[in-house]
Structure formats: structure tokens, C-alpha cells
Curated annotation (Swiss-Prot):
Annotated catalytic residues: 37 (proton donor)
Encoding gene, per UniProt annotation: panC
Quaternary structure, from the entry: Homodimer.
Name this polypeptide is given: Pantothenate synthetase
Native source species: Chlorobaculum tepidum (strain ATCC 49652 / DSM 12025 / NBRC 103806 / TLS) (Chlorobium tepidum)
Comment field (misc): The reaction proceeds by a bi uni uni bi ping pong mechanism.
Length: 284
């Protein structure tokens, strides 16, 4: 595995790989790698002959009261995990390399970015999608793999890649969960043992909603309210949002219609740690 820090060098390597007819897959991360990230690499390797991983803690997608400086950066450990997972190139630029003096461009992802995570974290999606487009330009991939856990992020990336005719295939990877159902996340390390136990309520809320949908209920707003009450039953759990949305547009929905795809989405603070989770389903 080759480690590269310079965007121009990475771009030259990617262009050379394309000239050699190598099919390139990219996995973008902020480091602090866990099983969820490694599952993205595995999926990328199943589709691409060459896999590039990026590690960049992007300051422009963190809000003023968020955990940019607290965010874990165990680079040596991450590099070892990437190497053992079969990554071919690890691109790890500095903030100065990505945003040099005079940098002024940003992308507005549109209305989908103003709801839910966008409302809770103003500016987050603009910063996220701008760096994604930059990294696509640097790594020149045919395929990019993103996790379904960040479902709104995935929907926005698909929209922007389509709207801007970028030409990269965007592949969503299933959520990887711990044995008790908690979605893997770099932020799980912030949870105390008691909070870690309470955090399983996110998955319990998903299981409850699935059970109610399986009863052919269509009243999604009511089911979401019941699931939120379950979340609030934990003493340190405080939902930012919990509702059903159209899977493509992330517009809130109150009633299920046969033949449509929906997603239950939630963001919940467990103590001081904010966790997200979701569940996608086709209503038949």
C-alpha cells in the first residue's frame, strides 16, 4: 500500500491507472476506522481492481460547537487497518493541501440538505459534498462506496454526482452493527458503559417500527411517535429527530403507499454523544 499526501501526486497516479485501464474504486473516510469502514473496502474490492482510501478530517463539515478537534485521529492504526484490508493507495492530505490560501469554492446541495442533519448541523452538507467532489476529482474513481448509515449524505452525494454529470457510480453499503444492534461509528468510543447500553435503544426503535410495518400499518407518523417514545424511555436519550421520509427526496411522510421506498431516520443524543441510525424498506 502506498501512502500519498499530495493531491497533485494522487491525481497523477489516478490518471496513470486509468490509462492502464484499471477500474478504480474509492472509499472516503475521516479515519478512526472500524468494521463499517472495512466493509466498504471489501465492497469496493469486489467491484474494482484498484482501491483508494482517503482519510481527511474535513473542517468545513463540522459546526462551531461540534467535535472537530476532539475527533480521533489514530493514523498509524488506520494505515495498518487499511493495508490489511487490501487498500492499494491511502490518500491522506493535510487541511492546507485541500484548502490552500485563496480557496473560495463551495457547493450548495439544494433543499435536501436543509432538513434533518442539515437543520441540526447548518453548513454540514455543503462542506461534506464540496470535499467529496474535490476528492472525486483527485482520485478519479469509476466507483465510490459510501455507507448507508449516513443515509441523507448518501442521497445528497447521489443527487450532486447526477446533477453535475460527474460520471462516478455511487454504491451504498449496508449498515454494519455490533452484536447488540448498535450501528458501528467512530463516535461510539465517546460513550460511557452506561450510555453504551442505553444507545441500543436506537436499534430497538428500528425493530419496533419494523414489527409494526410488518402488521401492514400505514400510519407512519404514529409509528414514528411510538418509536420516539421508546427512545425517550432511556434516561440519557434525547432525540433530535425521528421520522419516516421518502428514500429518494428525504421529504417527511405520514402515510405509507404501496410500491414506495421509505426510510426511518433518527438522530439521538446519548449524554453528550450524538448518534444516527436508519432503516430502509419498500412498502408492499
Amino acid at each position: 500500500m502506498q501512502i500519498i499526501n499530495d493531491p497533485a501526486e494522487m491525481q497523477k497516479i489516478a490518471e496513470k491507472l486509468r490509462l492502464q485501464h484499471q477500474y478504480i474504486g474509492v472509499v472516503m473516510t475521516m479515519g478512526a476506522l472500524h468494521e463499517g469502514h472495512l466493509s466498504l473496502v471489501k465492497l469496493a474490492k469486489a467491484h474494482a481492481g484498484t482501491v483508494i482510501m482517503t482519510i481527511f478530517v474535513n473542517p468545513t463539515q463540522f459546526g462551531p460547537n461540534e467535535d472537530f478537534y476532539r475527533y480521533p485521529r489514530p493514523f498509524e492504526q488506520d494505515a495498518a487497518l487499511a493495508r490489511s484490508a487490501g487498500v492499494d493507495y491511502l490518500f491522506a492530505p493535510s487541511t492546507e493541501a485541500m484548502y490552500p490560501d485563496g480557496y473560495s469554492t463551495s457547493i450548495d446541495p439544494g433543499p435536501i440538505a436543509t432538513r434533518f442533519e442539515g437543520a441540526s448541523r447548518p453548513g454540514h452538507f455543503g462542506g461534506m459534498v464540496t470535499v467529496v467532489v474535490k476528492l472525486l476529482g483527485i482520485t478519479r474513481p469509476h466507483l465510490a462506496v459510501f455507507g448507508e448509515k449516513d443515509a441523507q449524505q448518501l442521497a445528497i452525494i447521489r443527487r450532486v454526482v447526477t446533477d453535475l454529470n460527474i460520471g462516478t457510480t455511487i454504491l451504498g453499503a449496508p449498515i454494519v452493527r455490533e452484536s447488540d444492534g448498535l450501528a458501528t461509528s467512530s463516535r461510539n468510543i465517546y460513550l460511557s458503559s452506561n450510555e453504551r447500553q442505553q444507545a441500543t435503544v436506537l436499534y430497538r426503535a428500528i425493530r419496533y417500527a419494523k414489527m409494526e410495518i410488518d402488521k401492514d400499518r400505514t400510519d407512519l407518523e404514529a409509528i414514528a411517535g411510538e418509536a420516539e417514545a421508546l427512545v425517550r424511555s432511556e434516561p440519557d436519550a434525547e432525540p433530535d429527530y425521528l421520522c419516516f421520509v421518502d428514500d429518494a427526496t428525504f421529504e417527511p411522510v405520514t402515510q405509507a403507499v404501496t410500491g414506495k421506498a421509505y426510510r426511518l431516520i433518527m438522530a439521538v443524543r446519548i449524554g453528550s454523544t450524538r448518534l444516527i441510525d436508519n432503516w430502509r424498506f419498500d412498502y408492499q
